[in-house]
Amino acid sequence: VHRMMEGLAYLREMNVASVLLRLTVAMLFGGFIGLERERKRRPAGFRTYMLVCLGAALTMLLSQYESYMVTHAWHETAMEIGLRTDVSRFGAQVINGIGFLGAGTIIVTGKQEVKGLTTAAGLWASACMGLAIGAGFYECVLLGFLLILLTNRLLPFVEDAIIESARNMNIYVEFQTLDNLGDIIA
């Protein structure tokens, strides 16, 4: 157990092995989630999810690298010019950016149905997972990955069962004009 904890501590540090592991995990986990979405022929698939997760992990690694450099290698220069960093800004910008990508997957059909929300949410979750991977928060990453897969694979069946047993009904009606609307509602 002690050796395992030492190994995990080593992988949380900033070194070549840690960076390689984090980027590989981001690529694999993002791709695996995207594969499931692509199998269902959704707007974003294998490569999109892989790139979102990988990009988020890279951003977090860059954030950590900058923080380290400003407090170590660049410390004297940073102090001389009064340079301050806020490592949370990198992650925040990933979340902002993913909003635009997610918005591109959402459409309203001719029947006024909204489609693509799960894809947009999945891209957002994949980006968040990438940030956690980049930070080396492996326990969170593994649990998050499993829960994202569970949400995408198992919960649609639960959702369908709930909808089928519900007593509610959705009726879609389109009107050319509103002339007789009062008669129809009455």
Regions flagged by a language model, labelled:
Residues 31-42, 101-112, 157:
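C-terminal ends of transmembrane helices
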Residues 39-52, 86-95, 109-124:
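Short, non-helical or kinked segments that cap or interrupt transmembrane helices
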Residues 51-62, 121-133:
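Small-residue-rich segments of transmembrane alpha-helices in multi-pass membrane proteins
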Residues 30, 56-60, 98-105, 148-156:
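Alpha-helical transmembrane segments of multi-pass membrane proteins
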Residues 137-186:
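Canonical alpha-helical transmembrane segment with a positive-inside/aromatic-interface signature
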Residues 71, 89-105:
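Hydrophobic, membrane-facing alpha-helical anchors
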Residues 1-81, 88:
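Alpha-helical transmembrane segments and their membrane-interface boundaries
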Residues 6-24, 131-133, 138-151:
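Hydrophobic alpha-helical transmembrane segments of small proteolipidic membrane proteins, enriched
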